């Protein structure tokens, strides 16, 4: 399973939802054009918005959209584990995870698949992420790479493949399900924060690799970020919504 290349028949998208806005209806319609199959894992959305999710799933049909419903917010880790397990049980080998408000740029999925196919360490590639472009403050996300036992360094590029990274975010990332099964699920007790970080570090510890393909782009908001000046430096602090 580890060294195969995903096709639309072996790849699906997993989106964790929680009280999505009305714009999610059109968003899901666009995503259905990018993916052959989408799993929605809903984390206790309110009843009025739950009806919209049900209608959307019924509109596209089970062959296109499968809805997993939790009666409360069980957290991002548990929801992802539910989606990953469903994918494995139904014969899928790879998943791409998305936040409900993240938008793949044109060609992101195909670019990730191509990058995986040509990756020099494909059999050990646990996570292949896109380059994140922040919507509110249009800039590329900087990633971290371990320089030595004690130091880390920024790994920045606009093109090409960034290898041996330490931390990526879940949204937009392509996961190898065989490796996920070997490593074990996301930590349910982490709920939301550091779910992706813990998984990546665990993968690295077990000899797997994390990479970013810069030409694959995902439009994403890392919380509510604002540009701030401090001691002559430009900072971008993140202010998360209390309903996360």
List where the protein language model places each region:
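Short, well-formed alpha-helical segments that are part of the catalytic scaffolds
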Residues: 14-36
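Short beta-strand-to-loop acidic/aromatic patch adjacent to the donor-nucleotide binding site
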Residues: 92-103
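Conserved donor NDP-sugar-binding/catalytic core segment of glycosyltransferases
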Residues: 107-142
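A conserved acidic beta->alpha catalytic loop
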Residues: 42-53, 72, 102-103
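A short, conserved alpha-helix in the catalytic core of glycosyltransferases
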Residues: 173, 179, 183-184, 189-216
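Short, flexible, basic/aromatic active-site loop/helix in glycosyltransferases
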Residues: 145-166
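Glycine-rich, basic loop-to-helix element that forms the pyrophosphate-binding segment
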Residues: 71-89
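Active-site-adjacent helix/loop segment of glycosyltransferases
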Residues: 201, 209-244
